[in-house]
């Protein structure tokens, strides 16, 4: 058993299970995104390329090239459908004929998403000692620093820079 003055629930796609134990029923669904990281030398790319109409992005990394995108509502229990990653690789090769698509490492990640596309940030309904911070969908990494700042302000008893009312769990 552990004790704490305050708990922050930021468990991604599993957060709604924890919230339910506190009486908050949050309709979180899991978007699944796919990517393939190709090894160094797969393509000489200096900046990210976005193929929005085709549903994928090609990004340079220190570890190679990443081809990623796709959205699939598949929950937490279904096995990955890597044919989605394969399809993005084929499309990328079509646009970048010199792209070497062999020896890639495929990955699937969970994106905790809500029906209104607005994350849950703020106190639990039944306990002011629990703060929620989840449901950012495919913008989780992008919005994480801003959410962390708001949560820290809230937990420390400060007035957050942004009104947390629109982000409350009770809106569902």
Label the model's feature ranges.
Residues 2-128:
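Active-site substrate-recognition segment that forms the wall
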Residues 124-172:
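C-terminal lid/capping helical subdomain adjacent to the catalytic/cofactor pocket in oxidative enzymes
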């Amino acid at each position: 058993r552990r004790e704490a003055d305050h708990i922050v629930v930021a468990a991604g796609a599993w957060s709604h299970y924890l919230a339910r134990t506190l009486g908050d029923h949050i309709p979180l669904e899991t978007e699944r995104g796919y990517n393939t990281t190709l090894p160094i030398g797969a393509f000489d790319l200096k900046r990210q390329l976005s193929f929005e109409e085709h549903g994928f992005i090609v990004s340079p990394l220190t570890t190679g090239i990443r081809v990623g995108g796709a959205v699939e509502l598949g929950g937490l229990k279904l096995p990955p459908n890597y044919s989605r990653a394969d399809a993005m690789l084929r499309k990328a090769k079509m646009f970048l004929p010199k792209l070497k698509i062999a020896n890639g490492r495929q990955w699937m990640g969970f994106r905790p998403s809500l029906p209104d596309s607005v994350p849950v940030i703020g106190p639990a309904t039944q306990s002011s000692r629990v703060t929620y911070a989840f449901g950012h969908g495919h913008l989780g990494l992008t919005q994480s620093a801003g959410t962390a700042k708001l949560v820290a302000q809230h937990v420390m008893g400060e007035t957050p820079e942004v009104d947390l009312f629109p982000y409350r769990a009770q809106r569902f």
